[in-house]
Amino acid sequence: MHQTKARKTLKDAPVMWRRINSIGIILDCNSTYAANLGYAKSEILGKPIFEHVPKESWEAMNDSLKTWFETGEVTDRKITFKRQDGSTFPGLLQATSLYDENKNMLGSNTVIFDLTQMTDEKITEYKKFFSEANNRLGEIKEKEY
């Protein structure tokens, strides 16, 4: 129940969100992620993350994965992403690990900011979203414990 509410918060996010498994296959994403990349969600799920990165950025994405495997998170990693139409955009990637009850890594929740959209208006929208999301997640946590 609580995971469903937390997941809904991510699915409704104005930022790109995806969940991957431990080998980099996309298990879920929000509509913002799909729309920014120009795909239907069904075309994204089950694909490797490298399909949304131009070849010249594979090394940067691979370094990001390596950092994630070693530390369980990635913070402020600049990566170039590729849309379905072949155009690219600079993104800022943040990832945190997901673990099972035995502390085995299952995958990650990843948030990506399109740096070409970082206007004052967008930053205000993001701040509002994250403030509200933090409050909702706090309420969920209080009910859970």
Region annotations inferred by a language model:
Residues Y33-I44, K55, N102:
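PAS/PAS-like sensory domain cap-loop motif
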Residues I26-L27:
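Conserved hydrophobic beta-strand signature of PAS-family and PAS-like sensory domains
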Residues Y99-N102, T116-D120:
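Charged alpha-helical signal-transmission linkers that cap and connect PAS-family sensory domains
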